[in-house]
Amino acid sequence: MSRKESRMQAFQTLFQLEMKDTELTINEAINFIKDDEPELDFDFIHWLVTGVKDHEPVLDDTIKPHLKDWSLQRLLKTDRIILRMATFELLHSDTPPKVIINEAVELAKQFSDDEHYKFINGVLSNIK
């Protein structure tokens, strides 16, 4: 299965972990999907989810200067997660920035409000 589907599952896992009432660990959250989606790249999903959670303060500090009149806390949870995921990949992978940004834009089109993909694209274009 492609990285696109694995990124989507990483996003959904991070969203689930952000829920206030959850006590799930990263491994538990990922294990929930293994039965339903055995063809996904679980090494990549684990790397991305763990990386985002472990580096959250650094990722937030990297994102904040590019928000222009917004605070990270005011962003939709979906946008915050997408920005963190893409920023982590930009900083810690060999994947071309254009691919990472495009995948983030596609996630925003699917999971965020109508025009938020433009905001995501603008912020990430300044980070790369």
UniProtKB/Swiss-Prot annotation:
Quote the cellular component terms of the Gene Ontology held in the record: cytosol
- InterPro entries this protein is in? NusB-like_sf, NusB_fam, NusB_RsmB_TIM44
Sorted alphabetically, which keywords does the UniProt record give? RNA-binding, Transcription, Transcription antitermination, Transcription regulation
Q: Which SUPFAM superfamilies match?
A: NusB-like
- Would the keyword 4Fe-4S be found if you checked this record's keyword annotation? no
Look up the record and give one Gene Ontology term from the biological process aspect: transcription antitermination
* Record-annotated membrane-spanning stretches: none
Query: By its UniProt entry, which Pfam families does this protein fall under?
Result: NusB
Please give the Gene Ontology molecular function terms for this protein: RNA binding
Indicate yes or no for the key word Transcription regulation: yes
Q: Which PANTHER family match?
A: ANTITERMINATION NUSB DOMAIN-CONTAINING PROTEIN, N UTILIZATION SUBSTANCE PROTEIN B-RELATED
Q: Which family does it belong to?
A: Belongs to the NusB family.
Q: Which NCBIfam families match?
A: nusB (TIGR01951)
Q: In UniProt terms, what function does this protein have? A: Involved in transcription antitermination. Required for transcription of ribosomal RNA (rRNA) genes. Binds specifically to the boxA antiterminator sequence of the ribosomal RNA (rrn) operons.
Q: What is this protein called?
A: Transcription antitermination protein NusB
Task: Look up and give the organism this protein is from.
Answer: Staphylococcus haemolyticus (strain JCSC1435)
